[in-house]
Amino acid sequence: MEDKLILDLCLSALFVVVLSKLVSSAMKPRLNLPPGPWTLPLIGSLHHLVMTKSPQTHRSLRALSEKHGPIMQLWMGEVPAVVVSSPAVAEEVLKHQDLRFADRHLTATTEEVFFGGRDVIFGPYSERWRHLRKICMQELLTAARVRSFQGVREREVARLVRELAADAGAGGDAGVNLNERISKLANDIVMVSSVGGRCSHRDEFLDALEVAKKQITWLSVADLFPSSKLARMVAVAPRKGLASRKRMELVIRRIIQERKDQLMDDSAAGAGEAAAGKDCFLDVLLRLQKEGGTPVPVTDEIIVVLLFDMISGASETSPTVLIWTLAELMRNPRIMAKAQAEVRQAVAGKTTITEDDIVGLSYLKMVIKETLRLHPPAPLLNPRKCRETSQVMGYDIPKGTSVFVNMWAICRDSRYWEDPEEYKPERFENNSVDYKGNNFEFLPFGSGRRICPGINLGVANLELPLASLLYHFDWKLPNGMAPKDLDMHETSGMVAAKLITLNICPITHIAPSSA
């Protein structure tokens, strides 16, 4: 009798719980979510990405958007996501409702690599984030600061040109691995600009950075099921990402301490600041730390995360775009010849190019724009996250939804671009479209509050190397390869780099100076 009473009470309690949930659910207003493909338990929409048979996520998402529209709802495991594939929707999200979508989507791996979101690239929108970004914009990445690194860029590019001239003199049809050379160039420029010198720990840092970049390329089980402790335990990528970040953090802390010690020694000797590092990012941050008075104190931790953002961002974007540009020029000999003619006419026989020589090279700038259109380095931009439930184009976007803007798809859409799959720099002639974040059919660096703060630095790191390679060398494909046979597939992930290494043969046209 007593057992039956307990059973009845349990069943009654269960009935009340179920009924209350049903009533609560019925009383909740139904959300008008964007259209999207049908989902499966647990995995959500992931099977649709597999069914498109494209290894690149941005291509798979374009195929799905062509069926479901320019604003599309997906479920990446338990994570709600919206994919934007038109300029109008992008403008609504990134401009008109920018503040509502000002947070960053963090995967388990990016959270570990980028200091738990305490940096500028992936940090959530907050007072702290705003002050850190202000330091970047007003102290580290101003036009004057970027110009102050002109000598660094010119020296490192001249070094690369001399190395390639030596390769050209050695002959051979196998070609030079430009991925390695250009990556080294970018890393040397950013290291000198960041810490004032080549840095004895450079290789250790870059090795750890390369490992970290590989980990954030693909989704791990912890990214799909962030609420699951078990998924976090079994996921390998976040652990590898954390280990890599700790290695990089240790290197940066060593550099900071070495620089502090050097400045103290210089001060004790009455020498003032060492000229080599006078304008580097680290010296600027150490000055701010010493002066104080900033809304967010510039601690060593702040210096670490800001230097990490500077180095990791600049070491990836510029070489990726430069490799794509050279690959497109090799596939399009007419455009290559036109770009070379412009540079050679402007520089007129000098043995070394400076940035002052290339200010007026309009076609070179169009070539870079066209590369950024056809091969945006971040094809899905850096994803945003909805901070509060919002409405976009009549659809409800719940708080916490991740928002991906498929800039790769928008830049190849025939509704916004004539002959979108063709490489035509002339499309930007007498055209006001630029990459400053106001033309929503062309946002290679993003838009709004989260636009890339390093646009000026990134473009400066592109123009001089490209002009120098076009000026000093003619180029041919290895082993008699025809231009149309050059592989142009891209990688998947946050950055869409050229999948196959670019090997081409330099032929010296104007010999560089020897020193």
UniProtKB/Swiss-Prot annotation:
Subcellular location: Membrane
Cofactor: heme
Gene3D superfamilies documented for this protein: Cytochrome P450
Gene: CYP71Z6
Membrane topology: Single-pass membrane protein
GO biological process, one term: diterpenoid biosynthetic process
Known catalytic reactions: ent-isokaurene + 2 reduced [NADPH--hemoprotein reductase] + 2 O2 = ent-isokaurene-2beta,3beta-diol + 2 oxidized [NADPH--hemoprotein reductase] + 2 H2O + 2 H(+)
Species for this entry: Oryza sativa subsp. japonica
Biological role stated in the UniProt entry: Enzyme of the diterpenoid metabolism involved in the biosynthesis of antibacterial oryzalides such as phytocassane.
Family label: Belongs to the cytochrome P450 family.
Residues that bind heme: 452
Transmembrane segments: 5-25
Keywords assigned by UniProt, alphabetized: Heme, Iron, Membrane, Metal-binding, Monooxygenase, NADP, Oxidoreductase, Transmembrane, Transmembrane helix
Top-level taxon in the UniProt lineage: Eukaryota
EC number: 1.14.14.76
GO MF terms, alphabetically ordered: ent-isokaurene C2-hydroxylase activity; heme binding; iron ion binding; oxidoreductase activity
The protein's name in its UniProt record: Ent-isokaurene C2/C3-hydroxylase
Chain segments annotated as coiled-coil in the UniProt record: none
Any one annotated GO CC term: membrane
